[in-house]
UniProtKB/Swiss-Prot annotation:
This is U3 small nucleolar RNA-associated protein 25. Residues 1-170 are annotated as: Disordered. DEAD-box RNA helicase-like protein required for pre-18S rRNA processing, specifically at sites A0, A1, and A2. The keyword rRNA processing applies. Keywords: Nucleus, Ribonucleoprotein, Ribosome biogenesis, rRNA processing. It is found in: Nucleus, Nucleolus. Its main location: nucleus. It comes from Lachancea thermotolerans (strain ATCC 56472 / CBS 6340 / NRRL Y-8284).
Length: 747
């Protein structure tokens, strides 16, 4: 298999698919007998019968809230039987072993015990506000039967007249005609999700599970400042061949975009209105390939958010309209096989670091949607928007990250109907879920195992991680947890219509089709681990690499002359996992003796440590194995300790001050009395290198230090190439990491 072959008839044309029709008919019969479908698939039917039928459905649904345990067990067994039947009839892979609870998953998975580390990092959290947030999440996770779609039935009266995404109330014939013309364009959603043969999908899935996938890559040079790397998964037994990047037009005109979105966003003419950044990412985004994009400046966030907001809406509208069309087709011919759904309704998950970022993202989506009615918009603004600004003397990056509402605890659902956006919707009835890593962690990894729930993430087709560089300073494990829980086969049925679920959902292959978009200011090993290790999109992935010239590096922007020493320790014959141990040994054997017998200043030594585990290790060593007088300040220190230790360091009463990167990220202290700086590891953010090194300049200005004697020393290994590149420049970083010398000095 040279590659995954896309064919418009690949699925329906296979004998395996034909053989599954009898099973699908049985499932449709079972499904109809089990109760009403209450979700997107019935919206078009509900619009005509929003009176007496609603009451009848409510009467049918109500008993399910208090069904006995025996019925729940029977339901769970029936759900497992449905999955087994589908796979057996379809000739799919063996049934995936999943745990089915004897009892229905709890409807309110909230945590009564707050993680102490998380609460300490949220300095301004109020306990009553936390309780309100937990209650809101509790309500949003109530089983879908209790928060059905009664409110949808009255405002979706234009379904049949709006099958092409153009509202025809008081209709405009030209808009209708344009809507039909748009369908002549290639639909990348249809191509990506519905045109890959099941044989190829199964082969790639088996290769991933056996760890026999090989990625083949190629580079595209955009200009002298940037290049893109495209990688595609291939099977080990495929013949070696050069990989070429997918064709792209760098224009929205090449893609099928719903007509109402084109009208709302002024995209009807053929004029290209994309910015240079948007032209770089429009093709990977709209062709449903994965993307890790490192942007240059915070001002660029608006540009990529504008584009993915349009992409998200286009995906939701097209997916939803296809289901509504198929509802009508099934009414005309119930024997048709129309596979257009997942297990649950949510299709888009957006992860953001703060409420301010979430407010900006969701506001863009609302503005671009073309819908005027937004339920609970005032509540959304009240809870997510603030006009607060950080002090003007703080660095620009700090002001950008910590403006507005910096609360990092939230999960919010948004549901789209024909005329209305419903915020704070039930998660199982939402189209978009926007969350912080901490907020969704409360649901996915609840301390009470009975309250854990991840079924609402089972059918996510588009995952967006925004401002990853900021999320990395919260808790990376929370973000990793999302990737572990997404696209799993749900443990409960949730009224899924199995006769319409796509087979790659049934076969637990949704991860091969999910698109992941990651945006960050600074690429990092963690970012690479996500795109390389957690994303399995069969369509491949893109990463950009920015070339840093010396004048644009941290050294070029430092603005003062002092000794800058970069000291490398080697990892010959050692694995990546042994790097922290090698760094610590080098620190103990080389750096500590220099501190004890310093030829420069004996005090005023600031030791900057990016990783908290390294900080604890170094602190314990200095405390137990040396007689060095030192103090330490970190992100978990109380305010009294922060003030006291900084004052003693400034007065020279302690010789060394240990300072963590997370504390600097959240506070940006101006530490006084610094005469020597030691970086235990290169900072993740190059701005931090400049800010900390400039402490020496301030001491020199106050007459406390001489820049000819002061030193900035940085430990690094060849694994620190990404961080070094932004500090010294791309070419210099290559010399430092692979050159013959172990020590390099700049001045």
């Amino acid at each position: 298999m040279s590659s995954l072959k896309r064919s418009s008839s690949a699925i329906k044309g296979s004998n395996e698919y034909r053989s599954s029709k009898s099973g699908r008919k049985q499932l449709r019969t079972i499904r109809k007998a089990s109760g009403p479908r209450r979700g997107l698939a019935e919206e078009s039917a509900n619009e005509e019968n929003n009176g007496s039928e609603t009451e009848a459905e409510d009467k049918l649904a109500a008993p399910e809230l208090n069904e006995p345990a025996q019925d729940q067990r029977a339901g769970g067994e029936a759900y497992a039987a449905l999955l087994t039947l589908l796979k057996a009839e379809h000739g799919g892979p063996a049934r995936r072993k999943t745990k089915t609870d004897d009892k229905k998953t709890s409807a309110d998975p909230t945590s009564n015990v707050k993680d102490e580390e998380e609460s300490e990092s949220r300095d301004n959290e109020d306990e009553e506000e936390d309780e309100d947030e937990e209650a809101a999440i509790e309500n949003a996770l109530m089983d879908e039967h209790t928060s059905g779609d009664e409110d949808d039935e009255g405002d979706d009266g234009s379904h049949q007249d709006d099958i092409n995404g153009v509202t025809r109330e008081g209709g405009d014939a030209t808009e209708l005609a344009a809507g039909f013309e748009e369908e002549d364009k290639p639909d990348t959603l249809e191509i990506h999700f519905n045109s890959v043969s099941e044989k190829d999908t199964n082969a790639l899935d088996a290769a991933f599970k056996a760890k026999e996938v090989r990625y083949r890559s190629c580079k595209l040079h955009v200009d002298k400042n940037q290049e893109f790397i495209y990688s595609r998964p291939t099977l080990v037994n495929e013949p070696a061949s050069a990989v070429s990047a997918p064709d792209g037009s760098q224009s929205l005109n090449s893609y099928f975009i719903k007509q109402r979105l084109k009208i709302q966003n002024d995209l009807l003419d053929s004029q290209d209105k994309l910015t240079p950044l948007q032209k770089q990412i429009v093709d990977p985004m709209f062709q449903y390939q994965d993307l890790l994009y490192e942007y240059e400046d915070y001002d660029k966030e608006t540009e990529y958010r504008d584009l993915y907001a349009l992409h998200v809406l286009n995906h939701i509208y097209k997916t939803r309209d296809r289901i509504l069309k198929n509802n009508q087709r099934l009414q005309e011919n119930p024997d048709q096989e129309l596979l257009d759904q997942g297990f649950t309704r949510p299709k888009v998950l957006i992860v953001a670091p703060t409420r301010d970022a979430a407010y900006d993202i969701l506001s863009k989506i609302i503005q671009k949607s073309g819908l005027d009615q937004v339920d609970k918009k005032a509540k959304f603004k009240d809870q997510f928007f603030q006009e607060a600004l950080p002090p003007s003397y703080k660095p620009k990056s700090f002001q950008q990250l910590f403006k507005g509402n910096t609360n990092d605890f939230f999960v919010l659902g948004a549901k789209f109907t024909r005329k209305t956006i419903k915020l704070y919707s039930n998660f199982y009835q939402s189209d978009i879920i926007i969350c912080s890593p901490l907020g969704i962690q409360l649901i996915l990894e609840n301390t009470d195992k009975k309250k854990r729930q991840d079924d609402f993430l089972s059918s996510i087709e588009l995952l967006v991680v925004d401002q990853l560089h900021s999320i990395e300073f919260q808790n990376m494990l929370h973000l990793t947890s999302i990737f572990e829980h997404i696209n799993k086969i749900p443990q409960q049925q949730h009224d899924a219509d199995f006769s319409r679920i796509k087979m790659w959902y049934i076969n637990d292959q949704a991860k091969l089709f999910r698109q992941t978009l990651i945006f960050t200011k600074f690429s990092s090993p963690f970012a690479n681990s996500l795109i390389n290790g957690k994303c399995r999109n069969y369509a491949g992935r893109w990463k950009n690499h920015r070339v840093i010239f010396p004048e644009n590096s941290s050294l070029g922007q430092l603005g003062m002359r002092t000794r800058l020493i970069f000291q490398r320790f080697d990892l010959v014959g050692k694995s990546v996992s042994e790097e922290p141990d090698s760094r610590f040994k080098h620190f103990c054997s080389v750096i500590v003796p220099n501190i004890v017998k310093s030829t420069g200043y004996e005090d005023g030594i600031l030791l900057y440590i990016p990783d908290y585990t390294d900080f604890v290790r170094v602190r314990n060593y200095l405390r137990e194995k040396t007689t060095i007088l030192f103090g330490d300040i970190n992100e978990y220190s109380e305010q009294r300790q922060l003030t006291s230790n900084r004052a003693m360091f400034q007065q020279g009463r302690v010789k060394v001050l240990l300072y963590t990167e997370r504390l600097h990220h959240f506070r940006r202290y101006e530490i006084k009395g610094v005469k020597t700086v030691i970086f235990y590891k290169p900072p993740t953010n190059p701005e931090f290198f400049e800010e900390v090194a400039r402490y020496l300049g301030k001491s020199a200005f106050l007459g406390l230090a001489d820049l000819n004697i002061s030193v900035v020393r940085c430990l690094f290994s060849k694994l620190d190439g990404l961080s070094l590149e932004r500090i010294v420049g791309t070419e210099r970083a290559a010399v430092l990491t692979h050159g013959p010398n172990e020590t390099y000095e700049f001045k």
